[in-house]
């Protein structure tokens, strides 16, 4: 058409030049530019290019087209059309006007680069340049184009027009472009896309099937292949990856067409080439690259169900890549790693996990030859992929606390891979791996499993000093913020790694000790653990082989551990002469190191002398401690001992006492700790006298000395604790210093009150004295034996009580400028100078210590605190006798004290508030508010939050406060309820908050319950909602939170084999411990006690209301949702409470219980309801009439829940046990069962048959003669159930329901225990593993004592040994992949109509065919299977399409979809005229096999490597069309059942159609071929 128009214009014009001039005139527009292009192109085709026309073309180019290109730069909607037309017209002008115009325009454009018009000009004229004459210009053009493309910010026209034009240019331009590309240097990560853009544009010239010089053959260039690999594996955008695949595919195609051997030079002489071709192995090579490209294309789909079936092809690639003859690589392994890189980079984390697992499993099948590229891949991209925590989640079906499948595979892979590495490369590989762990911040879970994998590597000499340093870096850099238990376990594994992999000949004992110091002793390296013993044994075996230590002597013993430790202690204790005397304390790290090595050396010696004399161990310990004991013994007499030395000695003493006690569960002092404690006690008198002198003789005069004060008080506390442990006797060395210390401190404080202008030294002494008194008060509180009997105690108490509260220490002015301190590494509390902040810490310490003393006094003399002002006694203890002022002072001090100093204030308030609750309610409420505000602000501060929260709970929820508040029912009562709700709300975000609250309240109520007073427990009823919330507490955690909990449970299950379990105390902050605490508390209450009974009944009513409100809630209710879990916990608790219910109480709640049976519940809840009804009817048969009445409601109302009551009826033998006259009950049971055996609902009939069989068996057992007339009917019904249900799955279902645990094994009385309620029944009924509470969890929770009756805990039947059955587990049972060996049954608890479980029966088909014949419809033999489709809109549309085109049957996953409004809206009643059959997804395998046996061809609508084109496919008459799921398509196991896959030809970019549209296209094509007779033979 365009040619005709151009010819018409040229015919009408006499001169072409005039026509061109006319077209160039007027307003520039896209239409005018396109018309000009048409005319010029037609003139060029005619070959007219001389004379006037050439001149006219030159003028058009110069005067019109070039300005037009520049003018269109401004934009506008028509700009692209103008650019395209003008560029094409300009190219024609250049050809018409001659080569001079092209050269001139090209030179001008090169000067104007990188503007868009210049790019358009070059794209237009580049193909017009001549090779020999314009070679320099062509080379300039080639280089400029490539540089512009690689710059990254080039105009879009570079890739769209300039580079394709360059490909059409002469060879000099191509060669210059290739040289520019090759000399660009190593490509950065962001340069891969631009490079591939250039290569794709030049591919026809660089990868051509014509003979070309080798330097222009991209296949021979290593840089080309590395760029392609980067695009395949690392490119983020799909277009770049597509270009890389295109280049690879073209290179392979060109190699096959040329049929010439070639090879890209290898990167090294040992490995294979990046690319090579051999004509002899053409078929093998083509197959390899076809599979490779196919895999890379499949990975673009990003869908696991599409990709997983292709992974076996990846295995085949590895098999082809390794020579079977010599075991070396044929193909460069970097090609295989590109596939894994692509999988690791996928947005689909499931796909990334599959990629990681596939790589880790490689060495299970075949041992691959060593390759540096593979090692780099493991330490690079694989390590990056392994850093994702979500990869380590447990598989579906694995119990809680199971090992991570990926963690196990990683462990096995690392063991296998390192065992195959050459010895000379193993060290380098492991070092890089560990350094990679230290180079980045890892989450806790990956570090744990990587550390375990490293610890599993067999022992070898792989790591030297650098490796040990890398392990230290992992400990110190990557694990600071990890969860404590996970961090402790990882440290254990890293220590085992060091012991297995370190070459002891390359490291010294100093290196080892420095590494051990980086382990946290309070988390991993505790004495007495299995790990400690393993470390000692390793040191024993290797101590003679360590490299010489810098501390060693020259006598040949430098490598001995004993010699090293002896020198270490000597060097530590003595004060170095070169070290200046400083006012600051030394760092604690050296003391930690020395104490650790002393204890290790002693235990190593113990292993050596295990079967010899034990005295040697004590002698070795004495040798180590001699320098220390000698120095300690001189402390009390040598006044000139350097301060630094005394500090070090006392630090070492503290660390030794802290570390020497074994950390085994229930461990007591062993001979080492006993000997060590005895040795230290021998110097106790000297040490205690030294401490007394330093604390009382004004020797501590500087702010920095306050750190020393803390050290001295810690030493004194340790000595007191040790003396009490050994036996506190009058006149012992410790007791002799306590009274002088107390008196001196009081004297100093009294003197300080009288001074007008205090100096720094006096103020420091004042702080020291108060700190000493606080330490003594805490010691007496902890060890009552220290309480002095002397009359001197009362004056001290009176003095402390008379001190002004919250007195702020005056900042000393005279010395403040001259005092300053420098920061210490150990983060001392007093390390700042006397700035406001620095002195503020001193004041805070003083106030804290004062409130410690006051807290001690108030608890000691709590009986003296008056409740009202009229009760005040004569002033003995002023503070105790003025509680209002004391409480107000407490509120004041809370506003100034830091979070770490408020504990004693809370303890004081705990004593004061109960006394003032009646008279000063407003002040008490204010104290609650202030305290809660502080606690809520600390929720992100781990170190201070938990101790403060515990003190807060003890204060606000004190039993006396709760009792008084409940009695008054005033504002305090409602404030407590408000705080209670806020704490429960906080606990949903921060696990463990509710645990502390419920534990404290239950413990205090149990103490009250065991008291003599009858009313002491009565107030608990007023707070029963707290127990209610505890019984149903527990949130649904995010996936990452569940992963952390799973891994923590896994570590706990390791037991004492993991040292972290022994050392780290389990805080029991998990949510299920809240429920355990509440349940154990309820189990301990006595139903015969009136107050207990009232409490339990009130709780039961609240539980039933909770269940009812949950049922009415509009929250989405599905299996294991929060609503399901709450209802589940409600009925579990009601079962626990049942023994306390009497008949009168049950009269009030029985209707609610029966009503709950009519509610649509999950299976687990129905079991609990049924169980409770059985127990009620068993204990109180008087409620049987109400039970029979439940069967009398209209069928429409109860058809979905009548199965609940039929299940109860099936346990008739339990119900009638306490009924003397059983005949009427049995008769009624048979009547009801027979009635419901006639129900139209298949599920109801099955339940009724079970109940009938059980009742009839009971009648025969009891020889109930009055039912003899029913024998024939009942026996016939039961016989039919056994034998006549042979068609379809009915017989299987009848057998399954009889074998179901609730009807076969479960015994309502013998199984009535905590184990069944909280573990066995949830497990058997499909509740998530997070809800299973094993019996050992109850036993481990010792804060609440267990019930004396052990039978209440353990089940008496074999119920716990069963596995979940199909009847209740249809939605979680066997997967599609297992359907051929285990079919599934519908969950009758979910209101599913199960008649469609059986295959399509012939009578049903005939019925629909007969109806269709009467209506004149044409019936095909096409079956459409839509069981995998989820959305009702798609199902409704398919139903309508199938009915319109006369399909035989539409198979759906559940006939419930028919009642969905969305389905009905799209089906427009088509379901009434089309046979619908229910086949659940788990039954599809059997259904497809059955239909294949009947002669059907199973056709899948799926894109696969061997799919048939729909346009070419001929449908058989008996066709079964299987449609895939909306998201996942057809599962891989079902694809194997397909006879053929048909795909719809597509022209667009989007890779898939809506499933309804796809199905409709195939249904129409079948109808067109089979029924309309329009089929054409395939071409």
Swiss-Prot record:
PROSITE patterns hit by this protein: SAM_MT_TRMH_2
Binding-site residues for S-adenosyl-L-homocysteine, renumbered to this chain: 1501, 1524, 1544, 1546, 1553
Catalytically driven reaction(s): guanosine(18) in tRNA + S-adenosyl-L-methionine = 2'-O-methylguanosine(18) in tRNA + S-adenosyl-L-homocysteine + H(+)
Enzyme class, first EC level, given as a word: transferase
One protein family per Pfam: SpoU_methylase
Entry keyword set: Acetylation, Methyltransferase, RNA-binding, S-adenosyl-L-methionine, Transferase
Protein name (database record): tRNA (guanosine(18)-2'-O)-methyltransferase TARBP1
Source species taxonomy: Eukaryota, Metazoa, Chordata, Craniata, Vertebrata
